[in-house]
């Protein structure tokens, strides 16, 4: 794999020689994020042709929708995707070697009077992606967008009455799962602003939208009903039980034929503890089959390795400043996938490791990979992450890992890491490039 210590003639370097950029903003976005993206593709075993294709798509179809390049003194749209408002995040399914990235589409009218709450940019972005990838279907995209994001009238009402006081205004984002030369597209919806406009809770908006959908697509009804019953029991007993109430925070779905698409409901869990995670995993004891129990054993193993601090936590109301070193811990989260013709929702739990030491997290993951036969990942993961930030004191960093997700299906663990993706590789590439994350930067290594 090509690393920052030995750049050679890697895909990123060659494309950087070829590409022209229509603006300095896009040029900065490319050189800030593509080194890590290219290394991740290489590390995950994508062939050279697929690496060029995915990086080319990223440059042509994604970077134009990332907005102004963030600096400490520049006004910009803040995205809920990351704690400092960056609109892009790389993630890696370490056990399946699948690269993924998520972004909140932003354009020139985002945050202006023409689109105060960034409702419109995603429409243009998703249409462009649909032109280059076969199989994208927008039926459920359109349905959930109508149900969970502001319409023109609601946006005008919120704006004219100044009803939105919060920093966090994200309504939707897209994700691409890169599978060989192709990609699968997903959409995520955050109905917080819709909640302000309608007076309905975010939780009710999400569950009501899925209920309506399940009346048309009854093959997801059994799993949805099990999830509804579990959440109802948890929330009914929240005041007397050690576990707190569960609240839906966001929803996602695959942008494919609705007969094959999955719906995922994400629940915010404010109590971080192993017992709560076990409850989320088993749906309060309803899932007790052999595969679930095997997954539970691995979940407990990860909990022991990662050493996530326990506590009852609130999600922060605002963002961290760009470059600010976190001194916080986030609450937990789980999502439940509703598969067609499957009576049980499938859980995926999230270890909230943001703010913890990245070197220690990398070491813990390496042990897990070694124990379960993921030898290449055990050998390469920490090296890849260090080489993505070669000018930083890796032992001191505590913001590279945001979450670690875990699920278990077909007798196999699925573990993904969600990573800080900004000022990667040999940044700054140019003398005039801004540096925001400098708290743990060492003397710059020689590039000779």
From Swiss-Prot:
GO terms for biological process: ergot alkaloid biosynthetic process. Its EC number is 2.5.1.34. GO terms for molecular function: tryptophan dimethylallyltransferase activity. Pfam families: Trp_DMAT (PF11991). D-lysergic acid amides have been used as medicinal agents for a long time. The pharmacological effects of the various ergot alkaloids and their derivatives are due to the structural similarity of the tetracyclic ring system to neurotransmitters such as noradrenaline, dopamine or serotonin. In addition to migraine or blood pressure regulation, there is a wide spectrum of potential new applications of this interesting group of compounds. Keywords: Alkaloid metabolism, Transferase. Substrate binds at residues 100, 186, 188, 262, 264, 266, 348, 350, 414, 418. Pathway: Alkaloid biosynthesis; ergot alkaloid biosynthesis. CDD domains: PT-DMATS_CymD. It catalyses: L-tryptophan + dimethylallyl diphosphate = 4-(3-methylbut-2-enyl)-L-tryptophan + diphosphate. L-tryptophan binds at residues 80-81, 89, 190, 249. Tryptophan dimethylallyltransferase; part of the gene cluster that mediates the biosynthesis of fungal ergot alkaloid. DmaW catalyzes the first step of ergot alkaloid biosynthesis by condensing dimethylallyl diphosphate (DMAP) and tryptophan to form 4-dimethylallyl-L-tryptophan. The second step is catalyzed by the methyltransferase easF that methylates 4-dimethylallyl-L-tryptophan in the presence of S-adenosyl-L-methionine, resulting in the formation of 4-dimethylallyl-L-abrine. Homodimer. Belongs to the tryptophan dimethylallyltransferase family. This is Tryptophan dimethylallyltransferase 1. The gene is dmaW.
């Amino acid at each position: 794999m090509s690393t920052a210590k030995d750049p050679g003639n890697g895909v990123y370097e060659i494309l950087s020689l070829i590409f022209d950029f229509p603006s300095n903003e896009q040029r900065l976005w490319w050189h800030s994020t593509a080194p890590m993206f290219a290394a991740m593709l290489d590390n995950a075993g994508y062939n050279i042709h697929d690496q060029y294709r995915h990086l080319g798509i990223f440059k042509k179809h994604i970077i134009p929708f990332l907005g102004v390049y963030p600096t400490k003194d520049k006004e910009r749209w803040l995205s809920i995707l990351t704690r400092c408002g960056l609109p892009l995040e790389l993630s890696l399914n370490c056990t399946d070697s699948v690269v993924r990235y998520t972004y909140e589409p932003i354009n020139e009218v985002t945050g202006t009077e023409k689109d105060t709450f960034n409702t419109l940019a995603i429409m243009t972005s998703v249409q462009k992606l649909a032109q280059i990838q076969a199989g994208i279907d927008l039926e459920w995209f359109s349905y959930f967008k109508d149900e969970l994001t502001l319409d023109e009238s609601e946006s005008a009402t919120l704006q004219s009455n100044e009803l939105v006081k919060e920093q966090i205004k994200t309504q939707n984002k897209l994700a691409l799962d890169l599978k060989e030369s192709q990609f699968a597209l997903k959409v995520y919806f955050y109905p917080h602003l819709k909640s302000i406009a309608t007076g309905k809770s975010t939780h009710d908006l999400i569950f009501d939208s899925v209920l309506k959908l399940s009346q048309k697509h009854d093959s997801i009804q059994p799993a949805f009903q099990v999830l509804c019953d579990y959440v109802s029991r948890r929330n009914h007993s929240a005041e007397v039980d050690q576990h707190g109430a569960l609240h839906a925070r966001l929803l996602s779905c695959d942008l494919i034929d609705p007969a094959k698409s999955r719906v995922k409901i994400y629940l915010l869990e404010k109590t971080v503890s192993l017992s709560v995670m076990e409850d989320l995993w088993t749906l309060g004891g309803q899932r007790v089959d052999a595969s679930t129990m095997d997954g539970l054993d691995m979940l407990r193993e990860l909990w022991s390795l990662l050493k996530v601090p326990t506590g009852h936590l609130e999600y922060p109301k605002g963002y961290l400043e760009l470059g600010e070193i976190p001194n916080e811990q986030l609450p937990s989260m789980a999502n439940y996938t509703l598969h067609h013709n499957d009576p049980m929702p499938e859980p995926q739990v999230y270890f909230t490791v943001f703010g913890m030491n990245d070197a220690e997290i990398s070491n813990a993951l390496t042990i897990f990979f070694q124990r379960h036969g993921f030898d290449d990942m055990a050998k390469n993961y920490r090296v890849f992450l260090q080489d993505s930030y070669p000018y930083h004191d890796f032992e001191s960093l505590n913001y590279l890992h945001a979450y670690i997700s875990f699920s278990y299906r077909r007798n196999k663990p699925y573990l993904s890491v969600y990573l800080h993706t900004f000022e990667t590789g040999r940044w700054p590439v140019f003398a005039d490039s801004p540096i925001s994350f400098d708290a743990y930067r060492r003397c710059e290594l020689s590039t000779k």
